[in-house]
């Protein structure tokens, strides 16, 4: 058998050795720090939920402010239209006085402005007498100003806010174990004997003897 010839390696072909060194403190901290890291993750999740809740509340406040401004503009426009109608529905009065030796007579003619011809306001023709005309004038001049209906909120946004608050309360809530009173065991105990005086015992023994006789 021939001899095994060892191949000589050059110094450049050799690979550097890897030396693994463990830090005992870091190793111990990693092995014993599971609870600590869990608490840190929980705190980070709670902070993230709080930030999201603040953003949702800010968006909701902005939407409410925009709705309020829109309602205010609509109300101002309605009031301006009412004032314009009041200015249009006017009456011209002409009065003429007649002087007599005994009394003074004043004749007044009232001519209402016809808005139905100009298609500004649809007035219905009067059916009754002067009382109906006065009622129509009052109803045309007085325009009720009712509050505009408030728009409903966004249901999806409110549901998201409620879910975020519920999860926040679930994280911050602590479980408390309550001890139930042992009423059943106390009820099974026999009643305690009360102390009696000598006179009471004599009376009881006397009654027992009489009953035996």
UniProtKB/Swiss-Prot annotation:
Region Disordered, residue ranges: 109-213
Assembly with partners or alone: Interacts with KIAA1191.
Keywords for the protein's UniProt record, in alphabetical order: Coiled coil, Cytoplasm, Nucleus, RNA-binding, rRNA-binding
UniProt name for this protein: Nucleolar protein 12
GO MF assignments: rRNA binding
Residue stretches spanning the membrane: none
Statement: the UniProt record of this protein carries the keyword Protease: no
Subcellular location: Nucleus, Nucleolus; Nucleus; Cytoplasm
Coiled-coil ranges from the UniProt annotation: 33-96
Annotated Acidic residues bias: 130-139
Basic residues bias (residue ranges): 170-182
Primary gene name: NOL12
Span of the signal peptide: none
Entry keyword annotation includes rRNA-binding: yes
Family classification: Belongs to the RRP17 family.
